């Protein structure tokens, strides 16, 4: 009953219907079954909507209407007197919460319209009004409410903010880490700590690897119920437990013995084959058969009598015995067919090899792990203290605060438990243990309603644990008093062609070992309506593979993304769908595994005129041109003496100074000053007091005056106004916001600039003030190699969608293409130097010194990286968890399709057969095979091969190059909307039509030649942008002989009294010296001094050259000696020119440069380049100049038709010469 007040102020009593009993629910199910409704609710849906009074876990397969069930259940609760504000409803995303709220709102409006009872109308209207304040949202949002309201109980201010920007978090983390690292390096246990750092970083100076370890441990701990307790009690769990052979888990031993027995059984099956050849011609046993029988008997005996023959203590001996018994190869060949009998056993033996040695040294790493535990605990506390001081927290902090409030305050916890009639959770399979703890605290123990599908758990990278769902599933099935499991199997989304192929694939692929759930009848998809079962032969699933048999090896590898040929296959199929079946582009979606390296898809689709909307890529907001210009503008306003920022601002479209202008300004220095910044030179140029005032002409003087006046006004405004207003003042004063509107990707550029102003505003609202602080924050973000989130702009609606599988979850599309099926799963995590596990804690690779073990006496140490027992244990679990999630990703991708699913990949047709022997397998692919295969494509091909006698509901087709010609792919048929010859259609005069035609022609011409407009005729390698290089196509190249050089370098005269030696002058002098140095003579100081006299440089530069370093290069390095040995093959300072083609306009331009040195042999070339840059690590220069050397190599190869086999950088900017092979 519920009391409301009527218009006279009198109480109105509303009598609500009671909740349905199990018998009433069965009666309702029967009525629904017998009804003549076109769309009936299933019996399981009815059970999930109306069952009450206990915990309920709804396992909802893809497309089974779980959102419909949740909305109907919520509405039923409301109609039975449960106010909407007494329901806790958790969703995985804010978007899902908004959609759910809208659906409930529509249902309430509909119910109000249908209800004739005035009292019920008033009640439902109140529910509608309360909907906005109801607890429908993410767990993060709810935790914020709890902390805002009760944070005082644990000492947390209600006036906190959320640090959503990872860059801001990293800046704070870096500050805390650096301070803590210094403290630990100076503590009593510093030697142990240094050993810890060296174990992961190699040396104490480079802390990046150790820092990453600490950050990962911290982040992992935050997903647990209580990070501090986990770090104290679980972090070293495996390290403490697994120290002897006897500590190895029984499960691992069982798997080894099972592999041994399976090997014996498979070998017996092979020996029983008719063509095996058990007997010789004489009728006696063949030697091969005798050997195999011995293996079978011994393996079976050792498995049966393991405990008495070996036991855990003798495990190392068993491994040696088995290794010595079986052959080193994997296969047994019968009639030219290879059977991988021993493959699985070899993999298991590898896991257990060298156990005694590992355990001997493993104990030495325990003190290191204790130091790591102390450091991570200290880091967690210090980082939290900084966040408390700033009153800025991460989402995980807020959730832990909420948990702490509920755990430590019984009255608060009970008030929530009494308030909520039911605790409802959507996407339950993606919860982590922290969220599970919060839900447990809110529930009274028997009022939880959880909806999810373990087959769609794909957020392990967010520490989601599908075992939470799995454990509930098992517990509720075994102990019905704890809760009830309801299965929603009917799919209302997809046609039978999609459902059948999904069932066929996963019934052969997914079980508890890989996938975390057995894909049996209770998990298989069933069509929810008759219309879905109508067959369409042309919608049968397709596995389309580009045949790579003729691949020249230049195509991208799996790690580099999808190939051009694969994208062309997709384009061909889309053109066919669009032209032949009239399928609109928006009905087609491409699914990829990651957001990166998808540019080739957009590029290829543009070629074929197929519109596409992408899901974005890597974050490059701060690196966009328009944002970089604005940041340099702000840096200049803050400090005009920052030459780099000032030059960028002057060269920007806002002021448009060119190279000649800057050169004239640069000469206006003060002769009495050694160091003179560009800003001072500008001021002197304006008043005519520079060293060369005659170079400043009237036009340049006018530009300088405008610049100084504008900069002065900006600097004055920066002291008075907000950052937001300053940025808009810059936009308006120099029309920069309008300017970018005329450039390519105008909408994106304007959105980026607008976002910069908003972010500056948000920055100041966060408590930080001033231009200096904002610039410092941005620079720290860039220093930590982070970026800010990209800005989204409105996308066209009639276009093909490209998105990640993760992004597609919860969505549906008529036609789905799953791309890059040949891409290998990322196994990076299982090869790291450490692996974390919630139960076992950390396992590490230990860098052990085995000098004593080897009896080595000459070397100081012999270091070997060992996988400790905890590491091996975590590694095996992580590998299976990774494969399981990849399997679930494939399930999510396939079940997005409504009508048809395509798989796109690349494989060698000649090598794709013979995956395994099909005759001895059950329903599933063998576990060893599923573990071994590491791509979607391999799984599908294995299923197609092994179960070839079944109808698997998908076809495998190899696509040849001949199928991908322009004629074969075809062109889009685009209907002409207006007939240009029909004036009734056009409704415009001839004059206007001609004008529009002319404008269109000019626009097209500019578009075609845009790159040519902006590209100069001649460029140098250092000027060529790295991002543009892959698009350019070399068509001609020539190495210019030294005698053909017609232009000599022109050097401006020195007007100053004292010449400053620039780094570039030293570099030029070194190159000249290396060019004239006579290599036929011994290289010593005298030889170098003689050569030095021949070069064209002033005495200050010659004095600055480090001749000892040059002598050391020739005398102490193998490359220097190579110069002298093969001097007849050496060419020095060779100019080159490459003719390049702009990919858009097809305009040609010349790229020129000079190659420092190369050796030309009969069959190959060796390339050498000298660098005088200062550096900390050689890898910095290697990355910086890699593309430049690739360009030089390209020039040499084009000229001589020989490969460049070696490329060297000679680094002269350090303490001694270093040689780096690129």
From Swiss-Prot:
Pfam families: PDDEXK_1, UvrD-helicase, UvrD_C. ATP binds at residues 60-67. One of its GO terms (molecular function) is ATP binding. GO terms for biological process: double-strand break repair via homologous recombination. Its cofactor is Mg(2+). The keyword Coiled coil does not apply. GO terms for cellular component: cytosol; DNA helicase complex. Residues 524-810 form the UvrD-like helicase C-terminal domain. The keyword rRNA-binding does not apply. Gene3D superfamilies: 3.90.320.10, P-loop containing nucleotide triphosphate hydrolases, PCRA, domain 4. Residues 39-495 form the UvrD-like helicase ATP-binding domain. The heterodimer acts as both an ATP-dependent DNA helicase and an ATP-dependent, dual-direction single-stranded exonuclease. Recognizes the chi site generating a DNA molecule suitable for the initiation of homologous recombination. The AddA nuclease domain is required for chi fragment generation; this subunit has the helicase and 3' -> 5' nuclease activities. PANTHER family: ATP-DEPENDENT HELICASE_NUCLEASE SUBUNIT A, UVRD / RECB / PCRA DNA HELICASE FAMILY MEMBER. Heterodimer of AddA and AddB/RexB. This is ATP-dependent helicase/nuclease subunit A. The gene is addA.
């Amino acid at each position: 009953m519920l009391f409301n007040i009527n218009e006279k102020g009198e109480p109105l009593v509303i009598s609500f219907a009671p909740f349905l009993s199990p018998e009433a629910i069965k009666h309702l199910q029967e009525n629904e079954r017998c009804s003549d409704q076109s769309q009936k609710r299933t019996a399981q849906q009815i059970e999930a909507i109306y069952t009450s009074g206990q915990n309920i876990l709804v396992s909802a397969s893809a497309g089974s209407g779980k959102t419909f069930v949740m909305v109907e259940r919520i509405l039923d609760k409301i109609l039975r007197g449960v106010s909407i504000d007494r329901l806790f409803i958790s969703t995985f995303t804010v978007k899902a919460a908004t959609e759910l709220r809208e659906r409930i709102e529509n249902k309430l409006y509909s119910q109000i319209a249908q209800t004739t009872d005035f009292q019920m109308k008033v009640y439902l209207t109140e529910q509608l009004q309360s909907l906005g304040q109801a607890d429908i949202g993410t767990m993060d949002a709810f935790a914020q409410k709890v902390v805002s309201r009760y944070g005082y109980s644990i000492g947390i201010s209600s006036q906190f903010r959320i640090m959503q920007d990872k860059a801001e978090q990293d800046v704070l983390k870096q500050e805390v880490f650096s301070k803590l690292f210094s403290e630990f390096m100076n503590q009593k246990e510093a030697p142990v700590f240094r050993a810890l750092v060296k174990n992961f970083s190699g040396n104490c100076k480079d802390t990046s690897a150790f820092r990453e370890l600490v950050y990962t441990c911290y982040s992992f701990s935050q997903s647990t119920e209580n990070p501090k307790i986990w770090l104290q009690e679980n972090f070293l769990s495996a390290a403490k437990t697994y120290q002897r052979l006897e500590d190895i888990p029984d499960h691992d031993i069982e798997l080894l013995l099972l592999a041994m027995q399976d090997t014996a059984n498979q070998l017996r099956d092979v020996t029983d084959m008719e063509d095996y050849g058990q007997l010789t011609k004489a009728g006696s046993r063949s030697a091969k058969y005798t050997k195999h029988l011995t293996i079978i008997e011994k393996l079976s005996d050792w498995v049966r009598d393991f405990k008495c023959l070996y036991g855990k203590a003798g495990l190392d001996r068993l491994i040696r015995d088995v290794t010595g018994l079986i052959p080193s190869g994997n296969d047994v060949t019968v009639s030219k067919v290879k059977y991988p009998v021993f493959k699985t056993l070899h993999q298991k033996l590898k896991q257990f090899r060298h156990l005694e040695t590992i355990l001997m040294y493993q104990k030495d790493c325990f003190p290191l792990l204790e130091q790591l535990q102390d450091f991570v605990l200290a880091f967690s506390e210090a980082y939290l203290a900084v966040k408390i001081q700033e009153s800025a927290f991460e989402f995980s902090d807020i959730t832990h605060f909420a948990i702490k409030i509920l755990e430590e305050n019984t009255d608060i916890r009970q008030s929530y438990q009494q308030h909520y009639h039911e605790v409802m959770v959507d996407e339950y399979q993606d919860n982590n243990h922290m969220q599970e703890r919060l839900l447990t605290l809110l529930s009274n123990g028997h009022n939880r309603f959880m909806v999810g599908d373990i087959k769609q758990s794909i957020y392990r990278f967010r520490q989601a644990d599908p075992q939470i769902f799995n454990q509930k599933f098992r517990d509720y099935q075994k102990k019905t008093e704890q809760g009830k499991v309801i299965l929603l199997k009917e799919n209302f989304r997809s046609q039978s062609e999609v459902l059948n192929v999904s069932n066929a694939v996963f019934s052969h692929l997914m079980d508890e070992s890989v996938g975390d759930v057995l894909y049996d009848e209770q998990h298989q998809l069933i069509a929810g309506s008759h219309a879905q079962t109508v067959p369409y032969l042309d919608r049968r699933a397709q596995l389309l593979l580009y045949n790579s048999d003729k691949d020249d090896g230049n195509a991208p590898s799996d790690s580099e993304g999808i190939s051009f040929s694969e994208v062309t296959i997709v384009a061909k199929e889309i053109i066919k769908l669009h032209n032949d079946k009239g399928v609109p582009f928006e009905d087609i979606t491409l699914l990829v595994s990651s957001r990166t390296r998808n540019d080739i898809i957009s590029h290829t689709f543009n070629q074929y005129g197929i519109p596409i909307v992408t899901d974005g890529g890597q974050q490059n907001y701060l690196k966009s041109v328009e944002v970089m210009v604005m940041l340099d503008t702000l840096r200049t306003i803050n400090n005009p003496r920052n030459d780099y920022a000032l030059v960028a601002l002057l060269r920007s479209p806002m002021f448009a100074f060119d190279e000649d202008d800057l050169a004239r300004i640069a000469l206006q220095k003060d002769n009495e000053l050694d160091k003179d910044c560009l800003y001072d030179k500008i001021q002197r140029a304006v008043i005519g007091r520079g060293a060369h005032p005659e170079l400043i002409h009237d036009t340049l003087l006018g530009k300088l005056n405008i610049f100084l006046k504008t900069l002065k006004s900006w600097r004055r405004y920066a002291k008075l106004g907000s950052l937001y207003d300053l940025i808009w003042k810059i936009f308006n004063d120099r029309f920069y916001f309008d300017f970018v509107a005329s450039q390519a990707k105008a909408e994106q550029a304007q959105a980026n600039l607008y976002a910069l102003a908003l972010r500056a505003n948000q920055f100041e609202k966060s408590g930080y003030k001033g231009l200096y602080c904002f610039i410092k924050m941005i620079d720290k973000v860039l220093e930590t190699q982070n970026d800010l989130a990209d800005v989204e702009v409105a996308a066209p609606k009639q276009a093909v969608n490209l998105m990640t599988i993760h992004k597609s979850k919860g969505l549906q599309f008529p036609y789905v293409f799953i791309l890059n099926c040949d891409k290998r799963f990322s196994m990076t995590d299982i090869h790291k130097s450490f692996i974390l596990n919630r139960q076992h804690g950390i396992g590490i690779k230990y860098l052990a010194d085995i000098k004593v073990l080897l009896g080595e006496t000459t070397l100081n140490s012999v270091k070997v990286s060992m996988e400790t027992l905890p590491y091996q244990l975590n590694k095996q679990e992580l590998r299976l968890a990774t494969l399981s999630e990849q399997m679930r990703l494939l399930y999510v991708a396939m079940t997005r399709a409504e009508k048809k699913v395509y798989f796109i990949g690349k494989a060698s047709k000649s090598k794709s057969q013979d995956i395994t022997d099909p005759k001895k397998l059950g329903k599933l692919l063998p576990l060893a095979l599923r573990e071994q295969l590491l791509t979607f494509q391999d799984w599908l091909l294995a299923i197609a091969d092994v179960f070839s006698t079944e109808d698997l509901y998908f076809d495998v087709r190899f696509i040849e190059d001949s199928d991908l010609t322009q004629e074969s792919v075809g062109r889009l048929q685009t209907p002409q909307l207006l007939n240009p010859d029909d004036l009734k259609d056009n409704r415009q005069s001839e004059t206007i039509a001609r004008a529009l035609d002319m404008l269109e022609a000019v626009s097209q011409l500019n578009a075609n030649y845009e790159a040519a407009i902006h590209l100069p005729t001649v460029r140098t390698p250092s000027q060529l942008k790295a991002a543009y290089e892959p698009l350019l196509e070399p068509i001609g190249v020539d190495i210019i002989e030294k005698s053909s050089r017609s232009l000599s370098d022109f050097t401006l005269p020195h007007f100053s009294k004292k010449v400053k030696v620039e780094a570039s002058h030293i570099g030029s002098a070194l190159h000249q010296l290396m060019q004239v140095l006579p290599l036929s003579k011994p290289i010593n100081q005298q030889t170098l001094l003689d050569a030095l006299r021949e070069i064209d440089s002033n005495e200050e530069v010659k004095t600055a050259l480090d001749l000892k370093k040059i002598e050391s290069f020739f005398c102490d390095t193998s490359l220097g000696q190579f110069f002298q040995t093969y001097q007849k093959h050496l060419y020095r300072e060779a100019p080159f020119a490459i003719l390049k083609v702009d990919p858009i306009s097809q305009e040609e331009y010349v790229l020129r440069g000079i190659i420092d040195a190369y050796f030309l042999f009969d069959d190959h070339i060796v390339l050498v380049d000298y660098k005088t840059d200062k550096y900390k690590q050689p890898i910095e220069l290697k990355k910086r100049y890699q593309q430049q050397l690739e360009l030089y190599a390209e020039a040499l190869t084009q000229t001589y038709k020989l490969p460049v086999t070696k490329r060297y950088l000679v680094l002269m900017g350090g303490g001694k010469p270093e040689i780096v092979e690129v």
